[in-house]
């Protein structure tokens, strides 16, 4: 698979767009989530157990039959101990806004991701700084 940096380089050059589009993989939320689970050696059941989501809702989000809110996608990312890059990819592929360090709540979430906080510890941190817990 071609890296994002390589794609940006090609897009900046005079490479024909059709040639570039042919090498870009078809990415969707479900396949990216599955790849993250596989890379981390995790099962959906284990990850879902570490969230505040109802099991049915969580499985529907993971299977792509229901759109997950930003909070729910972040819960999955925390449970999988994803880094910021992978979390933002999941957020983008689920049509949610990316985490942005200049937004205070997002800065707290980035901090929690980078320090591998679980959902409980992340919610404590959010509440301590006058933000709602992830629901």
Predicted regions and their residues:
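The alpha-helix within a helix-turn-helix
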Residues: 37, 48, 77
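A short, Lys/Arg-rich alpha-helix, primarily the initiator
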Residues: 10-43, 121-134
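Short alpha-helical "recognition helix" segments of helix-turn-helix
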Residues: 43-50
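Recognition helix of helix-turn-helix/homeodomain-like DNA-binding domains
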Residues: 52-68, 93-95
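Key DNA-contact positions within bacterial/archaeal DNA-binding proteins
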Residues: 45, 56, 85
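Short, charged recognition helix plus adjacent turn
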Residues: 2-9, 20, 88-117
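Long, compositionally biased
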Residues: 79-80, 104-133
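Short, basic-rich loop-to-helix N-cap that marks the start of a DNA-contacting helix
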Residues: 65-78
